[in-house]
Amino acid sequence: MNKLLIMLFSLLTVVILSSCDEVKDSPLLFKATSNTNPEYISVRYYPEEIGYTLYPKESKYFIYSYTYIDGDLELTCTNCDNINYSLDCSFGIVKDNKGKNISATEEEVGVSVKNTDNKTLRIHFAKLKDKDLPMGFLGARATIKVYGRVGGKDVTTNISVYRSNHRFATL
């Protein structure tokens, strides 16, 4: 019985310690190196919470943009020299008194991304017009998933882009 308890305690200890994500596992980090319209385009970084979790951690970058403007924002990765990305776009709308997401193209949400030198993302915001927005428009969203290697590990960082026809104060 004692051997069984020791074995169970050892197994439980190994499982708990191996499931802890350490903070030193660095995500992809970015610095805003250019912003042609800082009054209407802002970027914020909210690091993941420090502590133990059973879920994978992802860093969180949020970009807010007013829909009626255009401009460019450049984000340069500070801890990886070779990044790739994918882009997914959608609209938030009200339909039948319920909020819904509908898929959209880059052109429809007015967001396009280019990887300029393998470590810099140039995000272009096109000016949107009311007549081009879907009925019940609440906002446009783009998710940029950025992939790279940090410390020999494959990592992903999400950059969420929100566009609204309500002007947000830049912080």
Would you name each region that the model predicts?
Residues 15-40:
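Bacterial Sec-dependent N-terminal signal peptides
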Residues 34-171:
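First exposed extracellular module after export/assembly in secreted or surface-exposed proteins
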Residues 8-9, 19-23, 102, 121:
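A ubiquitous, low-specificity "background" feature that marks scattered single residues
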Residues 1-18:
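Sec-dependent bacterial lipoprotein signal peptides
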